[in-house]
Amino acid sequence: MCSDEVRMFAFTELLERCPYPSMKTASIGLFKNQINGAFNSKKDRPPSVFASPVIVDKFFPILFRTSKKWCTEEDTFWDDYSYQMQALNLYLFLLICDKSENRTTVFDQEKQVWMNNEYIHHLEVTIDTIMERHKKDSNDSDEQQSGIRLMNLEMMKNVIEQIKQRMTLSV
């Protein structure tokens, strides 16, 4: 088994430089597994970097990005949808598993303000814009596809609502 630092480097490379979107998406799940392992490890071991502020400080700016193209070029949003859902689920997971100790600083006020202002707010605006467009175009010949997309947007909104309920901010 390699050290935490080596694994952190590998995740940084995967999330920042990997040219394959599906691999980036899958790496979020692997990253979450590492975090889960760190939180479940015995207390007598040295603390893992996977249960430390490094998660929020180094990886949040890498993981939680939005695109201005999403509202105007909807296909770009759908290309990123799986990644964004994985990222949102990772954030929700951190809010759940780090609630008692705040080892990652995920509950620090400035971190939550950043998350809301830089990511969640933009994602909500995008979701609302796309939903409105699909509701208007629901009579299209692509009605089934539109319905599936509306359902996916509702699922994303649901995860965001769960996140907001767990955040200590009043957003």
What are these regions (language model features)?
Residues 1, 65-82, 132-150:
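Acidic, Ser/Thr- and Gly/Pro-rich intrinsically disordered linkers and low-complexity segments
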Residues 34, 84-86, 109-112, 144-145, ...:
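Residue-identity detector for glutamine
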Residues 4-107:
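Long alpha-helical HEAT/HEAT-like repeat alpha-solenoid scaffolds in very large eukaryotic proteins
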Residues 121-171:
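Eukaryote-biased recognition of C-terminal alpha-helical segments
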